[in-house]
Curated annotation (Swiss-Prot):
Residues 1-94 are cytoplasmic. One of its GO terms (cellular component) is cis-Golgi network. Required for vesicular transport from the ER to the Golgi complex. Functions as a SNARE involved in the docking process of ER-derived vesicles with the cis-Golgi membrane. InterPro entries: BET1_SNARE, T_SNARE_dom. Changing residue 51 to S: In MDRP; uncertain significance; no effect on protein level; decreased localization to the cis-Golgi; loss of interaction with LMAN1; does not affect interaction with SNARE complex members GOSR2, SEC22B and STX5. This is BET1 homolog. It is linked to Muscular dystrophy, congenital, with rapid progression: An autosomal recessive congenital disease that manifests with severely progressive muscular dystrophy, and results in death in infancy or early childhood. Clinical features include hypotonia and poor feeding, delayed motor development, progressive weakness and lethargy, and respiratory insufficiency. Some patients may have refractory epilepsy and cataracts. The modification Phosphoserine is found at residue 50. It comes from the Eukaryota.
Length: 118
């Protein structure tokens, strides 16, 4: 951006009647330097923030991959258990299934009771 009369036509070292023009020019330069430094610090802050976000994203992606593998193994385990329960329920062992369910409920009730007393 050019400003009229700020340092134009003044030979170097000759401040004669144009001293005010040089001081205005240097004031603009100082302001530009100050604004440039402010902008540089803001850009540096944004850069460091984006680097930190990148590290956090990598960490979260690693955590999600681990959770995915754990969910897959749990799904397989539950699938096998449900398959065994289906086989057990299809057979003539309904009395055994009933006892197993009652035992499970009893164990869960005892665990609930112990936790509740704490």
């Amino acid at each position: 951006m050019r400003r009229a009369g700020l340092g134009e036509g003044v030979p170097p070292g000759n401040y004669g009647n144009y001293g005010y023009a040089n001081s205005g020019y240097s004031a603009c330069e100082e302001e530009n330097e100050r604004l440039t430094e402010s902008l540089r610090s803001k850009v540096t802050a944004i850069k460091s923030l984006s680097i930190e976000i990148g590290h956090e994203v990598k960490t979260q992606n690693k955590l999600l991959a681990e959770m995915d593998s754990q969910f897959d193994s749990t799904t397989g385990f539950l699938g096998k258990t449900m398959g065994k329960l289906k086989i057990l329920s299809r057979g003539s062992q309904t009395k055994l299934l009933c006892y197993m369910m009652l035992f499970s409920l009893f164990v869960f009730f005892i665990i609930y009771w112990i936790i509740k007393l704490r």
